[in-house]
Amino acid sequence: MAADLNLEWISLPRSWTYGITRGGRVFFINEEAKSTTWLHPVTGEAVVTGHRRQSTDLPTGWEEAYTFEGARYYINHNERKVTCKHPVTGQPSQDNCIFVVNEQTVATMTSEEKKERPISMINEASNYNVTSDYAVHPMSPVGRTSRASKKVHNFGKRSNSIKRNPNAPVVRRGWLYKQDSTGMKLWKKRWFVLSDLCLFYYRDEKEEGILGSILLPSFQIALLTSEDHINRKYAFKAAHPNMRTYYFCTDTGKEMELWMKAMLDAALVQTEPVKRVDKITSENAPTKETNNIPNHRVLIKPEIQNNQKNKEMSKIEEKKALEAEKYGFQKDGQDRPLTKINSVKLNSLPSEYESGSACPAQTVHYRPINLSSSENKIVNVSLADLRGGNRPNTGPLYTEADRVIQRTNSMQQLEQWIKIQKGRGHEEETRGVISYQTLPRNMPSHRAQIMARYPEGYRTLPRNSKTRPESICSVTPSTHDKTLGPGAEEKRRSMRDDTMWQLYEWQQRQFYNKQSTLPRHSTLSSPKTMVNISDQTMHSIPTSPSHGSIAAYQGYSPQRTYRSEVSSPIQRGDVTIDRRHRAHHPKHVYVPDRRSVPAGLTLQSVSPQSLQGKTLSQDEGRGTLYKYRPEEVDIDAKLSRLCEQDKVVHALEEKLQQLHKEKYTLEQALLSASQEIEMHADNPAAIQTVVLQRDDLQNGLLSTCRELSRATAELERAWREYDKLEYDVTVTRNQMQEQLDHLGEVQTESAGIQRAQIQKELWRIQDVMEGLSKHKQQRGTTEIGMIGSKPFSTVKYKNEGPDYRLYKSEPELTTVAEVDESNGEEKSEPVSEIETSVVKGSHFPVGVVPPRAKSPTPESSTIASYVTLRKTKKMMDLRTERPRSAVEQLCLAESTRPRMTVEEQMERIRRHQQACLREKKKGLNVIGASDQSPLQSPSNLRDNPFRTTQTRRRDDKELDTAIRENDVKPDHETPATEIVQLKETEPQNVDFSKELKKTENISYEMLFEPEPNGVNSVEMMDKERNKDKMPEDVTFSPQDETQTANHKPEEHPEENTKNSVDEQEETVISYESTPEVSRGNQTMAVKSLSPSPESSASPVPSTQPQLTEGSHFMCV
């Protein structure tokens, strides 16, 4: 039974300490014998951690673990064996039913044969097809296992999914949203079941047909990052470096936590793939002692598998292989990228175990290491040298009587390099870190020289590891001084990629930040000896399968802690550990929460669950070379604050724009309410509700104005802050540019590195600033709109097409959409440029409109739109009425003047004329169209006889009534005479206008009832235009009406009406040609008009007084 993870196992004998690997496993250190072991020195049991599981039915010293693919096997710590069969029942686990396990009986072998048995290995975990093939070939000279004859299954969907074991317990089931990997990447709700370390998903909870399966071991369960580009709130992912990334989403945060915990537990059964090893021969194998403490055996594993291809490599291929190793490539007879897993190699971590006959692994050989012997000088090569691309193997440096190791040509070359390096003395030994880079080693290196200050029997980190100028190693002062000594101020420089150097600094920070007061087990002056190669290999869980070691074997070669100068099993024996671990995973190796536990402190719970979520993928490791440089952090902070401020400014601008729109709406509603009150001034009971609404609108407008003022001030403050941050970034960029220019004059290696880093920072700043400049360019336009946001200002909307408020100026018009619906035809052509410029260029305060005598009438598209609005005037929303000025309201409060009604009639006539001209579709010029009106043509009269007759008949009654009330004799006066008469009779027009206004309202309500087909039909529009003619003509002037009535013969009613309409249209044309001229010019234009021949021949000769009347009223 393995020891429980409690305080009892911390009680160790004297000279024994413990340590914790990066993976979270606990190992024990014998300070006297300079050895390590997984087994507790008292109980003889291994400590159970998150990597292993302890079953109650296993004998003492046995442990349960999982392979890279998720197959279960058992570890015998007592005999150092691994097997896939249960030690009690002798049967394989039922969980392995989805794997093909080819176990071959191991024949009885002699002791010499056993010495040559290589370690077992797990083969072929390809990118998307996993085959668990535990073939055993004990006599294989090259340590190669057989492969399955075919792929067992492909991970994927439906038919390629893993077959679910119905007897396996279900860890968790429920609904999850999963994002599609292709197409629109939609989120689909699926029923997920987590069972037997595999995540199955179905269409519904019936669990009838498997839609897909995800084998969670080797997946990394983590929250989303900005690179994922997913905005879902409760979303997480299952990432794998060589397979697709699955994105999941839940409805609540609690569900997300539960699912992530369950999936993490399933994913953490392993961490890394294993590496293949060469066969190992041994002579003079020592006798094993209890717990293997005095003579701890360490597996020596070559870097590249010993096969025929590697043996036959040419010199060029050797060089290429070594350089590829420096870049983190695996060798399997050919170069391939780091992320490929064509062959999963067994790592050194299953190190110290031999496989039995029922074991899927092959035997392992060990050799003793006595660190007190004189051979320590050869064995303990500086760790600085081990970090280089030329990684030595210490095994061949022993005497031939100790060990005979067969290696590939590349490894022999490394051995030769080691001998040369050792012959150069300790001064050359101190240069090791320079080879700990990832660029080709044929580049020159500049090393600072310093004498070694360490005993030869210990492996250490580089002794002259002064940080680069742009990075600071945050060790404590006492440790820093004790380590570096007087010459430590010299700078270590590197011409190569800085990833590894940054990793070294990060290691130093994490291991020494809080440990200056912790006791050392010796008086050596080098606290940097706490790091060994296993520190780099013990990554958090899980990492990429291509990184070297699977979880099943990860803990077999524990690392030593900073507290001890002894070498861990891997460091002492396996000096050819896959350098990719430390070369491309600095973030995996030293994360702040993953620290070893000091001897004098209480053990803290180290769970792989807590470690796994903090790791990053291998691709991310290369992109943060100077992540912890203070200047870079400062740049990141400035850019982040600038981006956040940009968001704030954008939000405030949107809020301000919304407030402007609300303010304008309230203004329109308030003015419409005022107009409604004005129109019903003689009926206080009818306007009581409108008065209340007006009060509410006034309060709302005041509140909106206050909020608008606050928002404007807040936006200004936000822009000032934005400008300040932008200025800071600009200053920083200029300083960096100056620094870059200065470094361009210096031709040194460190200057080249700094130039590259500064250039990266400049590019990053440029990218951010260009992205923000798009919003900044719109600032000027937005501010103009805010400053000119008067009720009738159109500056703010100048880029939004025609100002929609122009359409709202029509009386009782609510929205543009209503005008469109009522018109039933396209918008009218723009009115004259003079009118448009007057409206758009005038800015008046709330509730004040331009005086009517000096500006054109409110613009509307067509006469049809006006008619539609007039016919539903009583039922229109109050805030859509046409606003009136304060002067108008004051005048109306005193008396109702007929000229107001006349002006409205003139407006309708003008709009009617525009509609007729547009209908004619001949592009007639309105200013010069006084020769003949469109309605004067015989074709128009013939086309519309029904409308003309209908209009005449409906208005005969009203005209007769008006004539009886006004006993004015008709005369054929000239326009000048008519003006004089109009001035004399103006006071009498008040009563008549009131009566006429009532008659007009009745007529409009009768004439403009909606047709069944709606107001959009062409027929309806024509009818409405004709309906408008007669009231406009008749109500134009009381005298004109009298003249028309007295001269109207019974036998020619249609001619009278037509002539009246035609001549009044001529009047409108004349008026429209001079909208802004003086009264004198208008009178001259009126006098210049003469009746056409048709009008002269007509029995009704005079509508000229109407012409003069209209001119008079529009000029006053």
From Swiss-Prot:
Ubl conjugation among keywords: yes
Chief subcellular location: cytoplasm
MF-aspect GO terms: phosphatidylinositol-3,5-bisphosphate binding; phosphatidylinositol-3-phosphate binding; phosphatidylinositol-4-phosphate binding; phosphatidylinositol-5-phosphate binding
Tissue and organ expression note: Highly expressed in heart and kidney.
Low complexity: compositionally biased ranges: 1088-1101
Amino acid composition bias (Polar residues), ranges on this chain: 930-949, 1036-1046, 1070-1085
Modified residues (Phosphoserine): S55, S382, S410, S568, S607, S809, S855, S933, S937
InterPro entries: PH-like_dom_sf (IPR011993), PH_domain (IPR001849), PKHA4-7_PH (IPR040392), WW_dom (IPR001202), WW_dom_sf (IPR036020)
BP-aspect Gene Ontology terms: reproductive system development
Sequence positions bearing N-acetylalanine: A2
Keyword annotations from UniProtKB, A to Z: Acetylation, Cytoplasm, Isopeptide bond, Phosphoprotein, Repeat, Ubl conjugation
Ranges of compositional bias, category Basic residues: 147-156
GO cellular component: cytosol; glutamatergic synapse; membrane; nucleoplasm; postsynaptic density
Domain PH, first and last residues per copy: 169-268
UniProt free text on domains: Specifically interacts with PI3P, PI4P, PI5P, and PI(3,5)P2.
Name of the protein this chain belongs to: Pleckstrin homology domain-containing family A member 5
